[in-house]
Structure formats: C-alpha cells, structure tokens
UniProtKB/Swiss-Prot annotation:
Classification of source organism: Bacteria, Pseudomonadati, Pseudomonadota, Gammaproteobacteria, Pseudomonadales
Protein localization: Cell inner membrane
Protein's UniProt keywords contain Cell membrane: yes
Organism: Pseudomonas paraeruginosa (strain DSM 24068 / PA7) (Pseudomonas aeruginosa (strain PA7))
Pfam short name (any one): MFS_1
NCBIfam families: PRK05122.1 (NF003477), PRK12382.1 (NF009048)
Name this protein carries in UniProt: Uncharacterized MFS-type transporter PSPA7_3302
This protein's UniProt keywords: Cell inner membrane, Cell membrane, Membrane, Transmembrane, Transmembrane helix, Transport
InterPro entries: MFS (IPR011701), MFS_dom (IPR020846), MFS_trans_sf (IPR036259), MFS_Transporters (IPR050171), MFS_YhhS-like (IPR023008)
UniProt record similarity statement: Belongs to the major facilitator superfamily. YhhS family.
Length: 402
C-alpha cells in the first residue's frame, strides 16, 4: 500500500519566490552602495601609508572616518526614511556616493601634495559615509515596506548579503583597477556606480509611508542601545580585518592579503544563505551567542597564524561568525518600537556598528603601534567575547517574566 505525499502547493512556493525577488530588487541598491565602499578598501591604507607617507593611525583613520560620518548622519537618515520614504533616501544616498568619487579623483590629482591629497580623500570619505547612512537603512525599510514586517529577518539578512558581498567583490576589484589603470580608476568607478544606482532607483515604486507617532530619536536610541552594544563589540573584528589586514600581512612578509577580505565576505554570505531562518526558529539572542563564539575563534586563528593560509582560514571563520550578528540583535531591537519608527530604530541600531568601525581604525592602530600588528586580533577577539557575554545577559533578561 502506497501513500501519496502531497507536494508543496505551487501558490505557496511562488509566494516565497516573489517575496525573495522583491527583497533582492531593493537590496540591489545596498549592493551598489557598498561596492563603492569596497573598491577602495584594500588600496587606501597602503596609499596613505606608503605613497603619501603617513603613519598607521592616519591610514586607519582614512577608513574609519567614513564610519564616523555614517554615525553622525544616522539621525538625519532615520528622519528622511520615516518622513520622506526609503526611495527618496536611496536617491539621496546614490547622489552622495557619486560625489564621493569626485573627491577621490581630486585626491589622485593632488598626489604630489600629500596634505592636499589627504584632505580631499577625507572629505570624500565623509561624503561616502553620509551616503551609506541613507542607502543601507533605507533599503531595509523599503524591503520591509514591500514584503511586510514578518519578513524583517529575511530582509536584514539579504541586505547583509548585498553589503558584505559587495565588499568581498569590491576589494579585489579595486586592487585590479589600480594595477591595470591607476588610482584614478577607483574614483571614476565610484562616480559611475553612484549614477547607475540613482538611475535604477528613480523609476521604482516607493514603499507606502507608515503613519503614526514619531518617537524622538534619543528615545529610540535608548531602547536599542543594549542590542547595539552587542553589535558594536562584534563589529570590531570586521573593522580590524577590513582596515589592517593588508598591513598585517605585509608586516609578516605574506602576500595576497586581499584574499582575506574575499574569504571573510564569501563565508559571511554563505552563512547568511544557509542559516538566515535560524533567527526566526531559535531567537535572535541564541543565534548571536553562537555567532560571536565562532567569530572569536576566527580572530584567535588570525592572532596565532604561523602562515598566511591559517590567517586566511581565520578571516573566513570570522566572516562566518559575524554573518548573523547584525540581524540577530537587529530583529530583537526593531521589535522594541512601533512600525512608524522603524527607520529611526534601524538608524539608531546601525549607529553602533558605525561607532565601532569608526573607533576601530585609530584605536586598533594605536594598539598596533604599542604591541605590533599581530596583537590587534587578540584585542578584537576579547571584544567579540565581551559581546557574547552581553548577548547571554540580554537573553536571560528577555526570559524573565514581566
């Protein structure tokens, strides 16, 4: 006797595919925006340190100042997203990305005058940071507005795939552009990408505005601060790899440092694709605890690596671990505010990763000056373990009655 097992209804399967397609069509703008961030990522520290002749602290600051600008722009970005809509925020962000490319072109033109070149570069990084504050959060808000709040974790996960995938692709692409065409090609590519993103966003239908009480930003910030602190501690590992992996490999006499950024991004994306639904099944705090533990192991591998291939494995493990930290804490944070304040909540929560990455450059550069480049990964590991301890505390608090 045989039993017929009914197949999954085509309508349900089609609905799932439709949700994913709608999300991907919006997080495409995050991919474009972060590609403009990834392209100069592996080149700028060496350019500032070797070509312009500045120290490791300034080399780190050139990367970190972008995140500081994003941090300062978050309140404004949240108001734009909630008040004018995510589409308008994406358009503003793409225009800013294109403008940042122009300042990078100026920096290359002034290469013979190091101070002027550095100043142009810093202004461009500030503009790019402000643009990032608009595009990243707006794409999440646009996606949630299109597919509904029950798919929040999925939207955040796909947005992360787009952002770190773009960084993983952009870093080696930037190196190749400089090798083939020269430094100017990075600025030109960023201008073109910003214009492309603007042109693609212009004809798309906007998400409906959610009406309701608008909480003051500092109230929203207060609600999401514990979750944001966990994210910030986990992000130090990524910031350390992104800013100093090229200088760390050079200090050890190793080649192919850019592969670490690609390994980090590739494993980050793989974990997001494989385990994104785990947040809905297990809860954000449980996922954050596991992920921060894995990230800590990866950073320990980088600290103790005897050769570049072990270092590469450490970067890959760090990317795998960090992959779900943002959505794991993020889902718990966004649930603390009304839907009409979703943009502000995303902006306030994301502010902590900006703060972390903004501080990481000069702080880790200072640690490197005192103890050598190898020590920075032990420092990042201790930060990730602190984030793990915070996630455990938040999880225990969430289970208390009342």
């Amino acid at each position: 006797m045989s039993v017929d097992i009914p197949p999954i209804p085509p309508a349900q399967d089609s609905a799932r595919q439709n949700v994913t397609l709608q999300i991907v069509s919006v997080v495409l703008f995050t991919f474009i925006g972060y590609l403009t961030i990834g392209i100069p990522l592996a080149v700028l520290p060496g350019y500032v340190h070797d070509d312009l002749g500045y120290g490791s602290v300034l080399a780190g600051l050139v990367i970190s100042v972008q995140y500081l600008a994003t941090l300062l722009a978050r309140p404004y970005a949240g108001r734009v997203i909630d008040g004018l809509g995510p589409k308008r925020a994406v358009l503003y962000g793409m225009a800013g990305s294109a403008a940042s490319g122009l300042f990078m072109l100026l920096s290359v033109a002034f290469q013979g005058w190091p101070a002027l070149s550095l100043a142009s570069l810093l202004v461009g990084r500030l503009v790019l940071g402000a643009a990032e504050s608009l595009v990243g959060s707006a794409a999440i808000g646009w996606g949630i507005g299109r597919v509904g709040a029950p798919h929040t974790a999925k939207v955040i996960s796909w947005n992360g795939i787009a952002s770190y995938g773009a960084i993983a692709l952009g870093a080696p692409l930037g190196v190749l552009l400089v090798q083939w065409l020269g430094l100017w090609s990075m600025g030109a590519a960023i201008v073109l990408l910003g214009l492309l993103g603007f042109a693609l966003a212009w004809p798309k239908l906007p998400a409906p505005l959610v009406h309701g009480e608008r909480l003051p930003f500092h109230h929203v910030l207060g609600r999401v601060t514990p979750h944001g602190m966990g994210l910030a501690l986990g992000a130090i590992g990524f910031g350390t790899i992104a800013t100093f992996i090229t200088l760390y490999y050079a200090s050890r006499g190793w080649a192919h440092a850019v592969l670490c950024l690609s390994a980090f991004g590739g494993c980050f994306i793989g974990a997001r694709l494989l385990f994104a639904n785990s947040i809905n099944r297990l809860g954000g705090f449980r996922v954050a605890i596991v992920c921060l533990g894995i990230e800590s192991l990866g950073l320990l591998l980088l600290w103790s690596a005897p050769n570049p291939w072990i270092g590469l494995a450490g970067a890959a493990l760090t990317g795998f671990g960090f992959s779900l930290v943002f959505p794991a804490f993020g889902v718990e944070a966004v649930n603390l505010v009304p839907a009409s304040n979703r943009g502000a909540a995303l902006g306030a929560y994301s502010l902590f990763v900006d703060l972390s990455l903004g501080v990481t450059g000069p702080l880790v550069g200072f640690v490197a000056n005192l103890f050598g480049f190898r020590s920075i990964f032990l420092f990042a590991c201790l930060a990730a373990l602190s984030g793990l301890a915070l996630a455990v505390a938040l999880h225990r608090r969430s289970r208390r009655p009342g």
